[in-house]
Amino acid sequence: MLNGMKAPLCVIAAIIAGAVVANAAEKAAGTGVGFKGPLGLQMYSLRFHTGTNALAKIDKARELGFRAIEGGAPRGMPAPEFLKMLEQRGMKLVSTGSDYARLKNDPDSVVAQAKALGAKYVMCSWIPHEKGKFSEKNAREAAQVFDAAGEKFRNAGITFTYHCHGYEFQPHGDGTLFDLIVQETKPEFVSFEIDVFWAAQGGADPAKLIEKHGSRFKLMHVKDLRRGAAINSTGTAPDEDSVAVGEGQINWPAVLKAAQAAGVEYYFIEDEAKNAVEQIPKSLRYLESLKF
């Protein structure tokens, strides 16, 4: 202490209390003894609650406890303005998205956009196809598009990921069409984001899927599927099939244990229900309570 003086007990107590508060503030929302994260929020979760107001979305995400997001700048808003809004709130954008057409026809513009946003990851969540008829041809064409775009991302220091959406888990040979996409893409160019809800809704076992493809999975959408929900290959489901994490049919200890063993780098809660802002706190509490 200054001048060799002993600090009064009240000062020591204050220092200890301050350290406890600081440590609590540093702990990411939703993490705990078992699940370590890091955990962010997919901003699509807030579409029913804040409309098109970008500032309201960011503030709601922060209010819910998140400091990292997956999303993008609103249409018409310059990336620097959006990033400033995040920075002022102690937040950051980790991952952003692109539609398939842009990846195929103008991947350079997607790279430029991702760099402007400071995104470490870019994900694509849909391959165009006739509803309910995703085919081997669709899968092989997508693999070529992903490899070509993925090389550009790799050269820019960005990781490209394809986000599964349920329709890819139709049988094909000894596996599925999702397996085909994995096999037909180069690991150095293409990684994957497992959406646990859509993997299960498409008929896959999410934990076994992660164990099968291991380090190809870099990101995860932490999202639960209602017990009794229909399983199909359409890639569509009612909003109410998205329930709070821990209240649905997913075996989360098995999934998250497999994900941590595989080296998944970032997790994002996504909740598609109309009452997502009520469900997300429940999801966070469940994740904090997990031990495995």
What is each stretch, according to the model?
Residues 37-42, 69-71, 93-98, 122-124, ...:
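Hydrophobic faces of well-ordered beta-strands that scaffold small-molecule active sites
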Residues 23-121, 215, 285, 289-292:
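N-terminal pre-domain/capping segments
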Residues 242-244, 258, 262, 273-292:
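Aromatic-rich peripheral "rim/lid" segments of glycoside hydrolase catalytic domains that contact
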Residues 10-19:
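Bacterial N-terminal signal peptides
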Residues 44-46, 72-74, 98-101, 127-129, ...:
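Active-site beta-loop-alpha junctions enriched in small/polar residues
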Residues 1-11:
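Bacterial N-terminal signal peptides that target proteins for export
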Residues 26, 59, 67-68, 75, ...:
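Active-site acidic/histidine proton-transfer and metal-coordination neighborhood
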Residues 155-249:
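Acidic/histidine-rich catalytic cores of soluble enzymes
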